[in-house]
């Protein structure tokens, strides 16, 4: 994001879900929230697929629920302020929201019910923004954003534990409504670390499911190019206790290459870009370390 925004303009962290289990580990934005019931497609219970937004989540507020984003400048540049802040929701009843920019005065918004995705935008030099729900019966919230008015916007939809197949279940009308409000030029798919197994050879079902997911995205984002990234290297120990590339990884990469070819989208081999066989161990043991000691995550 930093490299692209320096080259082509733009600022801000982009789309952020209302709540996040990993907000404390995200260095690109300071994210605080309270008063929400959170639902994700990776939940084992109480998730209604028909309600989910573009990120595979939906959030139900209690009166007084809030979410705040604050820019930062310690991790990367161009993230300390933005020019436009937005919040995305869908209400079947009237909704009262208040917003506070840069710890200033509250500004109140009252919106009526709608059949589709709703958005409130605030413009200015925004270093922090706090949205508070004063009343929101029958309202689902999806996320908020900090963007520039021109240049690059990069939205990172991280969903821990997802194989990518859950993309098939996001309602097409919801994706199309998001596309009208945030039209993407490029969609990058990076999945598979949770799919690869030690001896996995047959990923036919995964291939079939991901092909369906890609066609779903093509239908809902017809203007967007799509790029599939392969899994990177993932190391495990053999019977002698020596680290080596997990055999199932290379099999999965062949399947991913076939998926890209069959669906007519671009493909980039991250395994080869990392250095190929055994490259994860080299990254882990580098000084300073460039990957996690699970020998899985960069």
Positions of the model-derived regions?
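Conserved SGNH/GDSL esterase-like catalytic core that processes O-acyl groups on lipids
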Residues: 1-101, 105-208
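Structured segments of extracytoplasmic/periplasmic soluble domains
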Residues: 3-11, 147, 177-181, 190, ...
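Active-site donor-binding loop signature of nucleotide-sugar glycosyltransferases
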Residues: 111, 159, 231, 270-272
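Hydrophobic/aromatic beta-strand patches that form the interior of the parallel beta-sheet core
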Residues: 155, 227, 266-268
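Catalytic His-Asp segment of secreted/periplasmic serine-dependent ester chemistry enzymes
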Residues: 171-172, 233-298
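Conserved, well-ordered alpha-helix/loop/beta-strand core segments that scaffold catalytic motifs
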Residues: 186-192, 207-219, 223-234, 254
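Alpha-helix N-cap and loop-to-helix initiation/capping positions
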Residues: 201-209, 244-251
């Amino acid at each position: 994001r930093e490299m692209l925004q320096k080259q082509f303009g733009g600022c801000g962290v982009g789309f952020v879900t209302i709540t996040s289990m990993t907000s404390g580990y995200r260095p690109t934005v300071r994210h605080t929230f309270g008063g929400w019931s959170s639902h994700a497609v990776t939940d084992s219970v109480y998730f209604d697929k028909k309600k989910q937004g573009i990120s595979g989540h939906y959030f139900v507020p209690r009166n007084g629920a809030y979410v705040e984003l604050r820019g930062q400048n310690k991790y990367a540049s161009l993230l300390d302020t933005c020019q436009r802040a937005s919040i995305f929701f869908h209400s079947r009843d009237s909704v009262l929201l208040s917003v506070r920019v840069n710890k200033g005065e509250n500004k109140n918004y009252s919106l009526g019910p709608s059949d589709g995705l709703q958005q409130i935008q605030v413009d200015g030099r925004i270093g922090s923004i706090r949205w508070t729900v004063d009343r929101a019966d029958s309202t689902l919230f999806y996320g908020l954003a900090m963007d520039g008015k021109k240049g690059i916007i990069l939205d990172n939809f991280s969903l821990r534990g997802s194989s990518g197949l859950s993309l098939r279940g996001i309602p097409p009308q919801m994706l199309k409504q998001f596309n009208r409000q945030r039209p993407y030029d490029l969609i990058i798919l990076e999945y598979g670390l949770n799919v690869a197994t030690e001896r996995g050879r047959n990923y036919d079902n995964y291939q079939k499911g991901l092909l369906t997911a890609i066609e779903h995205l093509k239908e809902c984002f017809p203007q967007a190019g799509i790029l599939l990234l392969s899994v990177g290297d993932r190391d495990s120990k053999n019977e002698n206790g020596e680290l080596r590339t997990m055999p199932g990884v290379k099999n999965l990469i062949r399947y991913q290459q076939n998926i890209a070819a069959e669906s007519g989208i671009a493909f980039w081999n991250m395994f080869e870009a990392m250095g190929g066989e055994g490259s994860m161990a080299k990254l882990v043991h580098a000084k300073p370390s460039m990957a996690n000691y699970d020998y899985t995550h960069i």
